[in-house]
Amino acid sequence: MADARKAALDTALKKIEKNFGKGAIMRMGDAAQTTISTISSGSLALDDALGVGGYPRGRIVEIYGPESSGKTTVALHAVAEVQKQGGTAAYIDAENALDPVYAEHLGVNIDDLLLSQPDTGEQGLEIADALVSSGAVDILVVDSVAALVPRAEIEGEMGDAHVGLQARLMSQALRKLSGTLNKTKTIALFINQIREKVGVMFGNPETTPGGRALKFYATIRLEVRRAEQIKEGTNIIGNRVRIKVVKNKVAPPFKRAEVDIMYGQGISQTGEIVDMAAEKDIVKKSGSWYSYGDDRIGQGRENAKKYLDEHPDVMAEIRQKVRDAYGMDQTGEEDDQADDKSKDKATKPSDKSQAQAKPKKPVATETSLDLDDSKTDK
């Protein structure tokens, strides 16, 4: 009986491959899909909260929150990180509000950044689809979903009712994009705004525009909110921002990261290093004083940050210890071994695919993926 079932299965598999092509169906052990490639978010604290060391490649990420909370800053840091490691980034600026000077201060190479400011939502999403389909883009940012206005609404009169147009547009676009993103291993970052439901008496009245499709298709959803202001005397020089991982299909969700977003500078690297080093006792905190080894580096958090800014050698040393303590550098030999194992299992690739498999640019790292999505919110 067992042999008959096996023969029937083999016949079915051969028929599927004949009708739909080789690779249409395979055993997961043969496909070697047990690892997921990631790109750093540009923030150590956020990389740790994401659980896999960054944004997973080939997936959709939604970043939402109130106005001026730091959503665009978080996205631009990911763009800068991709470019820093030799990747290509594209930015769909539907809001027509991207500040190139600020982006450059965050480390974005604006000369190489692909920028589009579409007239309609349909045009913006078609451009996004074309860029992703090319297979040459590592990260695509759409800023923002709320600004992807359907053509019918733009060409219509003020006051005309256009119920559900944007939701249908997003649903159709995401159905097309999700498969292409997975094949090309492009990260799609969708920035979104917040709206309030009218008449909600109990529960959270907040919602995001664009319908439910993005909530379902997103592998990761990040909620970005200002926690408090950062002051220097009476001057406000930045904001303390909380980033909550509301949904995560590749690691446990609901983790949080707190970062300092300084005006004109973006996420403070020294701020997160001070916090993370203190949490692991790499930097000792006694009262209001911070100490590293036998040296006191500052009284109060802001003074400790200034010390690290002024001593880049100490900063680099502590940063490396933080990465080691949080397990962020365990991608070298282990990933090479994983690649070797997957090559042994897979069919011998062509010369072209072998060239693509070589690590020409260290844009991505790989992390083990828990394939059981039943524990996560889909």
Swiss-Prot record:
<protein>
    <recommendedName>
        <fullName>Protein RecA</fullName>
    </recommendedName>
</protein>
<dbReference type="InterPro" id="IPR049428">
    <property type="entry name" value="RecA-like_N"/>
</dbReference>
<dbReference type="InterPro" id="IPR020588">
    <property type="entry name" value="RecA_ATP-bd"/>
</dbReference>
<keyword id="KW-0227">DNA damage</keyword>
<dbReference type="GO" id="GO:0006310">
    <property type="term" value="P:DNA recombination"/>
</dbReference>
<dbReference type="GO" id="GO:0016887">
    <property type="term" value="F:ATP hydrolysis activity"/>
</dbReference>
<keyword id="KW-0963">Cytoplasm</keyword>
<dbReference type="GO" id="GO:0009432">
    <property type="term" value="P:SOS response"/>
</dbReference>
<dbReference type="GO" id="GO:0003684">
    <property type="term" value="F:damaged DNA binding"/>
</dbReference>
<dbReference type="GO" id="GO:0005524">
    <property type="term" value="F:ATP binding"/>
</dbReference>
<keyword id="KW-0234">DNA repair</keyword>
<feature type="binding site">
    <location>
        <begin position="65"/>
        <end position="72"/>
    </location>
    <ligand>
        <name>ATP</name>
    </ligand>
</feature>
<keyword id="KW-0067">ATP-binding</keyword>
<feature type="compositionally biased region" description="Basic and acidic residues">
    <location>
        <begin position="339"/>
        <end position="351"/>
    </location>
</feature>
<keyword id="KW-0238">DNA-binding</keyword>
<dbReference type="GO" id="GO:0005829">
    <property type="term" value="C:cytosol"/>
</dbReference>
<dbReference type="GO" id="GO:0003697">
    <property type="term" value="F:single-stranded DNA binding"/>
</dbReference>
<dbReference type="InterPro" id="IPR023400">
    <property type="entry name" value="RecA_C_sf"/>
</dbReference>
<dbReference type="InterPro" id="IPR049261">
    <property type="entry name" value="RecA-like_C"/>
</dbReference>
<dbReference type="Pfam" id="PF00154">
    <property type="entry name" value="RecA"/>
</dbReference>
<keyword id="KW-0742">SOS response</keyword>
<feature type="region of interest" description="Disordered">
    <location>
        <begin position="325"/>
        <end position="378"/>
    </location>
</feature>
<dbReference type="InterPro" id="IPR027417">
    <property type="entry name" value="P-loop_NTPase"/>
</dbReference>
<dbReference type="InterPro" id="IPR020587">
    <property type="entry name" value="RecA_monomer-monomer_interface"/>
</dbReference>
<dbReference type="Pfam" id="PF21096">
    <property type="entry name" value="RecA_C"/>
</dbReference>
<dbReference type="GO" id="GO:0006281">
    <property type="term" value="P:DNA repair"/>
</dbReference>
<comment type="similarity">
    <text>Belongs to the RecA family.</text>
</comment>
<dbReference type="InterPro" id="IPR003593">
    <property type="entry name" value="AAA+_ATPase"/>
</dbReference>
<keyword id="KW-0233">DNA recombination</keyword>
<dbReference type="InterPro" id="IPR013765">
    <property type="entry name" value="DNA_recomb/repair_RecA"/>
</dbReference>
<comment type="function">
    <text>Can catalyze the hydrolysis of ATP in the presence of single-stranded DNA, the ATP-dependent uptake of single-stranded DNA by duplex DNA, and the ATP-dependent hybridization of homologous single-stranded DNAs. It interacts with LexA causing its activation and leading to its autocatalytic cleavage.</text>
</comment>
<dbReference type="GO" id="GO:0140664">
    <property type="term" value="F:ATP-dependent DNA damage sensor activity"/>
</dbReference>
<keyword id="KW-0547">Nucleotide-binding</keyword>
<dbReference type="InterPro" id="IPR020584">
    <property type="entry name" value="DNA_recomb/repair_RecA_CS"/>
</dbReference>
